[in-house]
Amino acid sequence: MVARLTAFLVCLVFSLATLVQRGYGDTDGFNLEDALKETSSVKQRWDHFSTTTRRPVTTRAPANPAERWDHVATTTTRRPGTTRAPSNPMELDGFDLEDALDDRNDLDGPKKPSAGEAGGWSDKDLEDIVEGGGYKPDKNKGGGGYGSNDDPGSGISTETGTIAGVASALAMALIGAVSSYISYQQKKFCFSIQQGLNADYVKGENLEAVVCEEPQVTYSKQETQSAEPPPPEPPRI
């Protein structure tokens, strides 16, 4: 039983080796003699179990041994290609810093410059700062109005108007302070006069009270004297 199993395994190995040789050629150092060596070792191992053995069928090696190297010689290895970065930077998650400088890709549409708006902040101001030109709020009017129709004297007129506004505010503050001081002095003078009159009036009332009280005291003394009974007259002889 063991001998039959061994013979079946040997035949299976030979058949597989033949199929591999016919399909892919004798490559990678594959040789049928290796299988024969293995079967001989197996035979020596199992000799003490049975005496009947079957002679293995030998397969003929290919006539031209150089054919197995033809396949290796004809194979060419290609260099792996490098992946290029996308030419459009917008493909990287759709994030690009240049979008901040473009009014056309805003969600609410491109902003139109308004006629009455002046001194606003626009994308052109950002471009001027990035390019090193500096921020010029007096030259560039709001809404990105940086065309050729800008007035070069608008900055001077704006500065003049600002200075005039500050000067008028200071003048009004000074006038208000002077008028407040004058009204305070007038009120203080009026209160001082009123206090003097009140003091004189109080003094006069005190004098009248003193004058009126003196005769009253004299009269009361006289009344007390007349109210006493006359002394008794001595008897006449």
Swiss-Prot record:
It is found in: Cell membrane; Cell junction; Secreted. Residues 183-237 are cytoplasmic. It holds the Pfam family CD99L2. InterPro entries: CD99L2. Keywords: Cell adhesion, Cell junction, Cell membrane, Glycoprotein, Membrane, Proteoglycan, Secreted, Signal, Transmembrane, Transmembrane helix. Residues 26-161 are extracellular. Plays a role in a late step of leukocyte extravasation helping cells to overcome the endothelial basement membrane. Acts at the same site as, but independently of, PECAM1. Homophilic adhesion molecule, but these interactions may not be required for cell aggregation. This is CD99 antigen-like protein 2. The gene is Cd99l2.
